[in-house]
Amino acid sequence: MTRLQDDFYHAINGEWEKTAVIPDDKPRTGGFSDLADEIEDLMLETTDQWLAGENVPDNAILQNFIKFHRMTADYDRREAVGIEPVKPLIEEYKKLSSFSEFASKIAEYEMSGKPNAFPFGVSPDFMNAQLNVLWAAAPSIILPDTTYYTEDNEKGKELLGIWREMEEELLEKYGFTAEEIKDILDKVIALDAKLAKYVLSSEESSEYVELYHPYDWADFTKLAPELPLDSIFTEILGQVPDKVIVPEERFWTEFAAEYYSEDNWELLKASLLIDATTIWNAYLTDELRVLFGKYGRALSGTPQAWDKKKGAYYLAQGHYNQALGLWYAGEKFSPEAKADVEAK
């Protein structure tokens, strides 16, 4: 028997580890995972009842969840519709002829939830949590971290190969020719390699104090002169911001002017096309849902996708997780129990 002082982990967990099994559609197991699995089983069983019209909660938001869940679970309908809902979106992006044309539509794309390469968001100010301010992030990279892009990182090359293979299969499903697929992916990977030189690594991102870089709006707009930030935000907000916090300062000061430019348009357009072909995959056929998860499963070491039932539940749950969480709390943590905890 392992002694505590020799190997604390195995002394405590050794017997459990011998029989523990990681489910094929999960990346891990353990105490917290077991609890999550129990909650998942409860929610799947409960929502099955709701779909069948049984024990439906008297809550308008949850009733809307049930309606949406019924749609996500209707795989016959999803198969019949196929990729038709996404075709107009793909054609719209194919027809974009220049960066200036794209830039003139960024506000429209942002407000309609379409791909837009516009990495802005609103969050509390580090210096005053009562105040929400504008933050300028950076476009995301393909690999998990900038360290995967070094020449000697074999895992990065392996993952990029898996990503490319997945995208080749997806683009073929959307009717792109082999020549078009190669051209698009070559351009996307080229832009991604450039971008990885300027975005923050995971280690840098964890240094929260170092991420606070406030800019006056007039100074910030000069960092990407071809990006019409004033007109974009005026269309979205009705005014221009006073200031912006820039955690991804290296991207904005050293690369944004090139990234958001006519000279970079062909590479950026390829990236937008990829986004247009993937943004709604989870809502379409089951084949596309599973295929689109291939790269994510490689990252997490999960060998198997969720089955249809879980896929439909989590797709619907993602939009109603707060309402479902409150329902669960009400079922499992009564007001009396809450008061008892608060009193101790």
Protein language model annotation of sequence segments:
Residues D48-K344:
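Noncatalytic, helix-rich "gating/capping" subdomain that lines the substrate-entry/channel surface
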Residues R3-D7, A11-R77:
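Active-site-surrounding "flap" and adjacent substrate/cofactor-binding loops of secreted or lumenal enzymes
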Residues M1-L4, F126-N128:
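Extracellular/periplasmic catalytic domains that process cell-envelope and extracellular macromolecules
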